Amino acid sequence: MLEVALKLLEEITACGFKAYIVGGFVRDYILGINSNDIDITTSATPKDIKEIFEDSCLPSEDYGSVTVIMKGIRFEITTFRKEIGYIDNRRPAEIKYIDDLYEDLLRRDFTINTICMDEEGKIVDLLNGQEDLKNGVIRTVGVSKERFEEDVLRILRAVRFATILDFRLDSEVIDAIKDTRELLRGLSYNRKKEELDKIFGSSNANKGVELLLGLGLDKYLELDNLSKVKCTSSLIGVWTVLDVLDKYPFSANERELITACKEALNYNNLDPYTLYRFGLYANSVAGEINGYDIKEITETYNNLIIQAKKDIDITSKDIMDALGRGPGSYLKEIYGDIERQILSGRVVNEKSRILEYICSKY
């Protein structure tokens, strides 16, 4: 991927423009972390890029970005720019194309994200980002408070980078976050969740939770249960404890899983019927939160006599024929009873034995 990106840079520079890989990819490259997201910054305008690459697309010329596809790989190319004014502490009110890399880098968030790579693969570091990488520091470009007021999402990005990279926040960054954290109330829940997913889904999530609490961000993110969070191997487990389905946006699948996990939290996650009712995933997530041994939960689940309704050796028609009745809500009641009886070992999961039990009781 890097070879393709460098080839792309060569094609741009061959036309008389400056072009560099910038941001997260270069940062991760220096740290020895694999990355598949390459951003390119250039003195060429979107119009110039479109003339150079015939197969490029132009989704938003207003923001000076073009997506170029080379050898099946998508590259985001952004023109050097200066941002003038900000709207809603999130978006620039106006952008002005410029021809200076240094000035372009001054608008960016953190020094570690300003390191560039040229078409020869050489590192270009105009703001000493490598020094902060070496020292494990998250430092803003310029005055921290101004950077956060320009774009409040940067507060969560600071926490994310400190969490994922296991870096520390610069003292000025900490003070500025505390001064501007109330602006998080105006940030969309979609944006907040995107960043929080990355923080809570990190292998270093405990640090992320500690930072959010230490900076007092739980109040402004409306995460009242954050202090109760026990970071699990599942992101769903964190959201289950946070209990914010009524505030934050979740997919239908996430909602279903969180709801099941939340219910399973109230039961013994080694109980056969609980395992059968909520399934292995929900019980594993809830069990980890409740302090159960996940291996024991898995073994118990795998040894269940039945794991789903389809495993029961009887059909609704069998029940109706045995009782001489038609369809009705009573079938659900009987099935629920049968499930408990089989899982407890009181009734053998054989058609004749199940029918014998049903006929004697109903």
Q: What do the predicted segments below correspond to?
A:
Residues 1-362:
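Catalytic cores of the polymerase beta-like nucleotidyltransferase superfamily
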